[in-house]
């Protein structure tokens, strides 16, 4: 059996510590500094998720700030759109599979993708498309087209318990003996909901776990919010003789409950801090609509000999992408609070008055 190597597994460092006071003036000074430095010190990153929601700034203030941070950058504009309330992503046709790095391949059905980390001892697959048919008819042939042997898939790391990410996992387990990995909270979610194509419970992912296969180590971080057990990995990516550090953000759309959005915000802050320490300079998403993913694949495909790789955004670019996630989440939380306030005010205005005495 291909058990994950756990000798290097350790929890990620705690992000707790003293929280400096933050005035409204300081709030916007930090925002201005972030726009110039593109991620040197995240806006409000030193506040807790709960405390950040007490500001008088409106949801639209946050949305405007996110748009300002994005500017004309299509990668950043994509995540602003993806986190905007009411956004409905397009369903483009599936692109041809592509090695976006020497050791990283993407096989996509257009609106959701699987990412293969190619190692000296086989494949670590991140997500498995929508269903067994897509795994068999798109994922497996796509890997073969890129010179990767699907029979060497050793692990399927499922970022979260939604069908468009786990759908093909059990097929890969049954066909190739791959081990399926998911955070405990999302294994529990599958057990509760019992959705179609759910994989049989296999390996739990610990926060900060290091999964080593051959010459490659992938670090798996718990980033709950999109679901209770969302996971986001760091991975090495080789390009033109240099090894970079990439990340894949495991969940996109904010959940309905305000408390879950606050959890999502806390995860984004923690993950961005870990990214800084790891010098992450590559940003990926399992949903290409959230980061201009399909377009960047075509840029790379059309210029295969270019020294530049559009997925290498630099440490500041990766931080700015996460800064926009943070800022949009603050806006979504503020919008929830505004809706609650409006409802309370309306009820108070229409409720009958009680007697004033006796």
Regions found by a protein language model. Give the residues of each.
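N-terminal secretory signal peptides
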Residues: 1-22, 33-41
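Zn-dependent metallo-beta-lactamase
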Residues: 42-44, 48-122, 132, 356-358
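Active-site HxH/HxHxD metal-binding segment of metal-dependent hydrolases
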Residues: 56-68, 104, 133-137, 143-210, ...
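Short catalytic-loop micro-motif centered on adjacent basic/acidic residues
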Residues: 106, 125-127, 155-158, 220-222
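Metallo-beta-lactamase
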Residues: 123, 130-132, 200, 210-212, ...
């Amino acid at each position: 059996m291909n058990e994950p190597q756990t000798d290097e597994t350790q929890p990620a460092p705690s992000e707790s510590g003293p929280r400096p006071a933050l005035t409204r003036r300081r709030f916007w000074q930090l925002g201005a500094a972030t726009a110039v430095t593109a991620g040197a010190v995240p806006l409000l990153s030193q506040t807790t998720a709960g405390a950040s929601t007490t500001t008088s700034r409106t949801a639209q203030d946050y949305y405007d700030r996110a748009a300002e941070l994005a500017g004309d950058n299509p990668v950043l504009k994509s995540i602003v759109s993806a986190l905007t309330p009411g956004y409905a992503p397009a369903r483009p046709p599936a692109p041809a599979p592509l090695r976006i790095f020497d050791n990283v391949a993407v096989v996509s059905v257009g609106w959701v993708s699987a990412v293969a980390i190619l190692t000296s001892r086989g494949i670590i697959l991140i997500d498995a498309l929508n269903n067994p048919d897509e795994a068999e008819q798109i994922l497996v042939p796509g890997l073969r087209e890129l010179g990767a042997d699907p029979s060497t898939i050793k692990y399927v790391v499922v970022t979260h318990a939604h069908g468009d990410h786990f759908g093909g996992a059990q097929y890969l387990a049954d066909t190739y003996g791959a081990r399926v990995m998911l955070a405990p909270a999302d294994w529990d979610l599958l057990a509760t909901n019992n959705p179609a194509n759910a994989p049989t419970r296999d390996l739990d992912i610990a926060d900060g776990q290091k999964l080593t296969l051959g010459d490659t180590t992938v670090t798996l971080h718990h980033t709950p919010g999109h679901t209770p057990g969302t996971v986001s990995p760091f991975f090495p990516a080789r390009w033109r003789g240099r090894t970079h550090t990439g990340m894949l953000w495991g969940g996109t759309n904010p959940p309905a409950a305000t408390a879950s959005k606050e959890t999502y915000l806390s995860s984004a802050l923690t993950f961005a801090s870990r990214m800084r320490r790891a010098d992450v300079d590559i940003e990926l998403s399992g949903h290409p609509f959230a980061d201009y993913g399909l377009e960047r694949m075509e840029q790379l495909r059309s210029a295969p000999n270019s020294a530049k790789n559009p997925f290498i955004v630099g440490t500041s670019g990766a931080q700015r992408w996460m800064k926009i996630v943070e800022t949009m989440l603050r806006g979504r939380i503020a919008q929830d609070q505004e809706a609650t306030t409006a409802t309370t005010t309306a009820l108070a205005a229409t409720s009958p008055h009680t007697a004033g005495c006796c």
